[in-house]
UniProtKB/Swiss-Prot annotation:
Keywords for this protein: Activator, DNA-binding, Metal-binding, Nucleus, Phosphoprotein, Receptor, Transcription, Transcription regulation, Zinc, Zinc-finger
Biased composition (Pro residues): 27-37
Biased composition (Low complexity): 38-57
Region feature Disordered, mapped onto this chain: 1-72
ZnF (NR C4-type) ranges: 79-99, 115-139
Biological process annotations from GO: anterior/posterior pattern specification; blood vessel morphogenesis; cell differentiation; female gonad development; fertilization; forebrain development; interneuron migration; lymphatic endothelial cell fate commitment
Gene name of the encoded protein: NR2F2
Assigned protein family: Belongs to the nuclear hormone receptor family. NR2 subfamily.
Annotated segments matching region Interaction with ZFPM2: 117-414
Protein's UniProt name: COUP transcription factor 2
The species this protein was found in: Bos taurus (Bovine)
Length: 414
């Protein structure tokens, strides 16, 4: 039976006494009674058309009045955390809506983060979502106050899968449903990106053949383990699980390659595929290098969007829950799971990247082109040394059926 998540409302984020001194001098502006429609004032209706926010910001909102300059100045105040346009004073400092929400969420849920670099990451409009540890560190450094975050009704910090079993007609609660769903997607990752290997994080480093094969095995294993631990997927019939992963494993592999900035230099890839040791016609070499170029282009286009971890998790869920797989027992259910993942991504992008209205569309447009990377080419490039002629689809089926870590014949995954 589907469960309906009851909606909840956050308390006001404004800190008492955080507005300027002009607010206390201006008389309060009466607002409409609860439930009454808002009717904007027009000249001749007896009374200024200023809003409470305008009154608090400038005292007197008339052109040339004493509050006009101050109001204009406030409109250009930057967020002290990332430099974006400030929406007002939140938790003691002028910040944008994104940093306000991030700080509130981090404090209320008592979240702890880790930095993948040297704990000195740049925090600005373009990089504020790259490192949550350094973003929270800067929030506290500039003077945002933990004690100013009001405690209100909070969604569960450990949501269960049942909480997300909503029917298509049920409204999605953005805070409890979508953020909780993304948290579960992220928590399902068996390997943090940094654990794919230090060489993987250095795009200019030319990896050896063994390192390439080991990294490829880790990424494939990571995709299967992630799918096995995300919401809803384990509840599907095992035949449906196998069908979905057998169809989408190569797309998940490309997404993982982009997420960990996998070096894709031509020479070691050809060596890993064994093509340097076998005679090949010139046409076949050109064709194979063209496949490598397509792979490189897809990875680079994803990296150019600066996709963060939450977005990658949502994109992988959208790819995984596809109704294109053959032999699905419940196509409509799989389609609904894809829609839920897409809604989660859309709301996340809207809240975390409010100044990039086209970002959600750009992310979705990257998905169809992932299929231009041939799965057979990925097998030849990365897995022929590991498993020989054994199809990857067979290995995926064995991993799902075994229910435990799969032991590769080439090396052990830890």
């Amino acid at each position: 039976m589907a469960m309906v998540v009851s909606t909840w409302r956050d308390p006001q984020d404004e800190v008492p006494g955080s507005q300027g001194s002009q607010a206390s001098q201006a008389p309060p502006v009466p607002g409409p009674p609860p439930g009454a429609p808002h009717t904007p004032q027009t000249p001749g209706q007896g009374g200024p058309a200023s809003t409470p926010a305008q009154t608090a910001a400038g005292g007197q909102g008339g052109p040339g009045g004493p509050g006009s300059d101050k109001q204009q100045q406030q409109q250009h105040i930057e967020c002290v955390v990332c430099g974006d346009k400030s929406s007002g004073k939140h938790y003691g400092q002028f910040t944008c809506e994104g940093c306000k929400s991030f700080f509130k969420r981090s404090v209320r849920r008592n979240l702890s983060y880790t930095c993948r670099a040297n704990r000195n990451c740049p925090i600005d409009q373009h990089h504020r979502n790259q490192c949550q540890y350094c973003r929270l560190k800067k929030c506290l450094k500039v003077g945002m106050r933990r004690e100013a975050v009001q405690r209100g009704r909070m969604p569960p910090t450990q949501p269960s899968h049942g909480q997300f079993a909503l029917t298509n007609g049920d409204p999605l609660n953005c805070h409890s449903y979508l953020s909780g769903y993304i948290s579960l997607l992220l928590r399902a990752e068996p390997y943090p990106t940094s654990r794919f290997g230090s060489q993987c994080m250095q795009p200019n480093n030319i990896m050896g053949i063994e390192n390439i094969c080991e990294l490829a095995a880790r990424m494939l294993f990571s995709a299967v383990e992630w799918a096995r631990n995300i919401p809803f997927f384990p509840d599907l019939q095992i035949t449906d699980q196998v069908a979905l992963l057998r169809l989408t494993w190569s797309e998940l592999f490309v997404l993982n390659a982009a997420q960990c900035s996998m070096p894709l230099h031509v020479a070691p890839l050809l060596a890993a595929a064994g093509l340097h040791a076998s005679p090949m016609s010139a046409d076949r070499v050109v064709a194979f290098m063209d496949h490598i170029r397509i792979f490189q282009e897809q990875v680079e286009k994803l990296k150019a969007l600066h996709v963060d971890s939450a977005e990658y998790s949502c994109l992988k869920a959208i790819v995984l829950f596809t109704s294109d797989a053959c032999g699905l027992s419940d196509v409509a259910h799989v389609e609904s799971l894809q829609e839920k993942s897409q809604c989660a991504l859309e709301e996340y992008v809207r809240s975390q990247y409010p100044n990039q209205p086209t970002r959600f569309g750009k992310l979705l447009l990257r998905l169809p082109s992932l299929r231009t990377v041939s799965s057979s080419v990925i097998e030849q490039l990365f897995f022929v040394r590991l498993v020989g002629k054994t199809p990857i689809e067979t290995l995926i089926r064995d991993m799902l059926l075994s229910g435990s870590s799969f032991n590769w014949p080439y090396m052990a995954i830890q």
